[in-house]
């Protein structure tokens, strides 16, 4: 949990959420662009307080070396003072969010949300910039999404769905919902 410790005492936090895109230029000057779906879509830059002395924090810093870049680590913004990065902006309650399900028809840069709450069709399920999670991976909503009259809604996100869904998955939006990590542990 060393990343969590560093996050909780950080002076600043930076998030790089850019897609991994490459461009090539052919001999006739035609530009070709392609996107690679990455497993590690977000890069975090945490600047800990200046008083984080190595001599006093060897255990925390050593626990960062063990997973390094090879193993998955999780950070929970909701349990620190940095929840403003992921704060949900829509009109659903936490219970309504937990009852919604991401559908198997989700693909590419459109996630499909079902089991919608009974709220007015003009109410916002998501606002542009909201963080949502499907399975293990997080996505950023790119446009406002209203409830509408249909049983499902399309939620446009900033990058393509990494793992296709084989069954419905509970919705996680902003600081609300239950996340299941690779080890099967849950946290909110």
Predicted regions and their residues:
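Extracellular/virion structural assembly segments
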Residues: 1-188
């Amino acid at each position: 949990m060393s990343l969590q410790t560093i996050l909780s005492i950080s002076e600043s936090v930076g998030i790089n959420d850019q897609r991994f895109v490459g461009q090539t230029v052919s001999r006739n000057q035609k530009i070709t662009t392609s996107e690679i779906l990455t497993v590690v879509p977000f890069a975090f830059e945490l600047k800990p307080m200046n008083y984080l002395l190595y001599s006093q924090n060897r255990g925390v810093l050593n626990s960062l070396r063990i997973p390094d870049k090879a193993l998955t680590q999780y950070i929970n913004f909701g349990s620190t003072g940095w929840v403003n990065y992921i704060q949900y902006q829509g009109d659903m309650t936490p219970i309504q969010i937990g009852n919604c399900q991401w559908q198997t028809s989700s693909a590419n840069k459109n996630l499909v949300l079902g089991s919608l709450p009974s709220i007015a069709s003009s109410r916002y399920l998501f606002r542009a910039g909201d963080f949502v999670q499907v399975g293990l991976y997080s996505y950023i909503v790119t446009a406002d999404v209203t409830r509408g009259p249909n049983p499902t809604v399309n939620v446009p996100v900033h990058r393509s769905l990494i793992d296709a869904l084989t069954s419905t998955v509970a919705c996680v939006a902003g600081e609300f919902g239950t996340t299941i990590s690779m080890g099967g542990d849950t946290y909110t």
